[in-house]
Amino acid sequence: MLRLRCKARSGTQPLPGLTAHSRLRDMQAALAALTGVPAPAQRLLLGFPPRSLDLSDGERRLGELGIHSGDTLIVEEDTSKPSAGSPVVAKRTMAVREAVPVLARRVVPADNSCLFTSVYYVVEGGVYDPGCAPEMRSLIAQIVASDPEAYCEAVLGKTNREYCEWIRREETWGGAIEVSILSKFYQCEICVVDTQTVRIDRFGEDAGYTKRVLLIYDGIHYDPLERKIPDSDVPPQTIFSTTDDVVLAQALELADEARRKRQFTDVNRFTLRCMVCQKGLTGQVEAREHAKETGHTNFGEV
């Protein structure tokens, strides 16, 4: 049995029930049922960088097409092709069109790794994996270590080696430097919506990326943003086009609503407690000074 995933506009989900001996037409039928994109209108991409699959012969076996366990198939709809689908697909598509999708926050745990969990969730098309943080921390450390000239002490605030050791620790919080690195790695614009200032910081804005993902930030905690259809089992959308400015406006509306409800943390005034020595602290500056003096980096908000 092949362990496959499919990624479409609506999100990422498992693609079960196929083997290397399954035929292309069987896989396309399964993809149509999952994504709502009829087989005649499908354009399938595989690998990195993504390459287009030859769909001319539906009788070919998946093994012959170079499809292996662990692969993710990207499903796009070619609107230039006829899209007459089965009644089931047509009915599902009609129901989806009648509903209005909304942009919403997907809450993740406040466990010092919320940034990494949130970024993984959005770039993977809605895959929630709280165990992804160690791998992402290690990835960032490898990228930083590989380019000590670009990632020097002036940029990192500590030596390259110290930073690499620091970011691997599970109690270390991620921030702007890590978002910038992940934007380059995933080749997508990462927009961080700040609920305190109601502004959007766009990492990778000038890099020419075609994809955009969004996080919402309250001063200490990150959550991913997703566009979803209420009361529907249709997977949420977390990856947007960089030409989609509507989603940016919706994100600012969310941030403004959170600000009016005071759903943010003023990092200069919030009260913390060092979870190592139990000392009370006020604001980010005191926390940083305490960490520098004692080496304690595990803080909880009071």
From Swiss-Prot:
Localization per record: Cytoplasm
Domain (OTU) ranges: 103-228
GO biological process: endoplasmic reticulum unfolded protein response; ERAD pathway; macroautophagy; protein K11-linked deubiquitination; protein K27-linked deubiquitination; protein K29-linked deubiquitination; protein K33-linked deubiquitination; protein K48-linked deubiquitination
Entry's Gene Ontology cellular component terms: cytoplasm
InterPro entries linked to this entry: OTU1_Ubl, OTU_dom, Papain-like_cys_pep_sf, Ubiquitin-like_domsf, Znf_C2H2_type
Spans annotated as Variable-loop: 167-177
EC numbers, comma separated: 3.4.19.12
Location of region: S2 site: 245-250
Protein's UniProt keywords contain Zinc: yes
Region of interest called Cys-loop, as start-end residue ranges on this chain: 108-114
Enzyme class: hydrolase
Alphabetical keyword list: Cytoplasm, Hydrolase, Metal-binding, Protease, Thiol protease, Ubl conjugation pathway, Unfolded protein response, Zinc, Zinc-finger
Residue ranges of the region described as His-loop: 217-221
One term of GO molecular function: cysteine-type deubiquitinase activity
Zinc finger intervals, C2H2-type: 272-296
Reactions that this protein is recorded to catalyse: Thiol-dependent hydrolysis of ester, thioester, amide, peptide and isopeptide bonds formed by the C-terminal Gly of ubiquitin (a 76-residue protein attached to proteins as an intracellular targeting signal)
Keyword Cytoplasm: yes
Binding-site list for substrate: 220
Region (UBX-like): 5-83
Main function: Hydrolase that can remove conjugated ubiquitin from proteins and participates in endoplasmic reticulum-associated degradation (ERAD) for misfolded lumenal proteins. May act by triming the ubiquitin chain on the associated substrate to facilitate their threading through the VCP/p97 pore. Ubiquitin moieties on substrates may present a steric impediment to the threading process when the substrate is transferred to the VCP pore and threaded through VCP's axial channel. Mediates deubiquitination of 'Lys-27'-, 'Lys-29'- and 'Lys-33'-linked polyubiquitin chains.
Protein name stated in the entry: Ubiquitin thioesterase OTU1
Annotated source species: Gallus gallus
Organism lineage string: Eukaryota, Metazoa, Chordata, Craniata, Vertebrata
Gene expressing this chain: YOD1
